[in-house]
Amino acid sequence: MTAAPASVRLFQTHEMEALRRDRRLDPQVFRKLRNDLLKKFESDEAVLEKYPVAEAIELHSLKLYQRMDSEIDGATKLLFETESGMLIESVILRIATGRTTLCVSSQIGCAAACDFCATGKMGIAKNLATEEILDQVVQAGQILRGEDRRLSNIVFMGMGEPLHNEVNVTEAIELLTAPDHFARSPSTVLVSTVGVPAGMLRLAKRFPNLNLALSLHSADQTTREKIIPLGKKASLAQLHDAIHEIQTIQDREFMIEYLMLRDVNDSAKDADRLIDWIGDLRVHVNLIPYNTIEASPHLHASSRPVIESFADILKASGLKTTVRYSLGNDIEAACGQLIRQENRQRAMQARRTESESDSHVGFLDVRQVVDGLESQKNK
């Protein structure tokens, strides 16, 4: 029999089983522990008091480095430090309807290099481990339990391209929806991507009730490639075909995200292109006001009247359309704003001290939660 290590990691099944056998514990002990921590989000103190064996378990893989609460709305930015010493961010969004959404990161930095995105400007991605993705959920859930609030939705719309970390993101979703772990419905989870057709299809097949979103931002191939360099790898036709195939698997609307950029993609002609591209796909379009970033001074936000006019054109064609406005502007939690000088410095230090190529990482972006996610649950 393999002896249990001095401390074991919460989401490592083999390590946990070795610990159980080493301590000769009833299998129900760990079932109850996971139930209290992952479903009820009880505090560490409560878990340690109820289960002395928890002292031998690493309950968290992330260290909460800083918390910032918005003074103007219900957003909270959580800054976590990873074991590698780099920083990631999650955002809690307390919606006026009473729903609460957590926006999680899947990578440190991002390789997609979107022109409008702070993260994309700042470096090559380093994948977060499955346990680092899940610990964002655990720690946010514990905060919300203290407020007597429930976590309604989890969206992979934070830092990084989830489908560039497909293995760990998929495993995280497996555990989020596993009855013996978080036991969440897949319909409460959303994954947003800039467009990786094969990965989108794999997720849809594995989780038919999972919500998926595409960061489209233009229905003109040339324009999209300018603002999303990764668009060169997957054409608009390929993305349309992927969504069409996904909708033969999933009986639900597909989310389309469209960032409104002045004189780039916000004309009536752009709206008509979008309508034509969507065609007979069952989608919900979310129009997103742009938050300016220093690294892209040539990009500007569309005016509110232009956004509303664009929305009217889409609605007149029969498309479900929502204009979304930011939460957390005062704490830099809104789309494209999550950048920290400290992480720049840590990334520079990592470049000097680490030899592995995947250490060249860095910066943070959280996109706003997609409106309409709640309406998908029972479809």
Curated annotation (Swiss-Prot):
Domain of life according to the entry: Bacteria
GO cellular component: cytoplasm
Cell compartment(s), UniProt: Cytoplasm
Catalytic activity, EC: 2.1.1.-
PROSITE patterns: RADICAL_SAM (PS51918)
Keyword S-adenosyl-L-methionine attached: yes
Chain sites annotated for binding [4Fe-4S] cluster: C110, C114, C117
One GO BP: tRNA methylation
Family statement: Belongs to the radical SAM superfamily. RlmN family.
Protein name: Probable RNA methyltransferase RB6963
Organism: Rhodopirellula baltica (strain DSM 10527 / NCIMB 13988 / SH1)
Lineage of producing organism: Bacteria, Pseudomonadati, Planctomycetota, Planctomycetia, Pirellulales
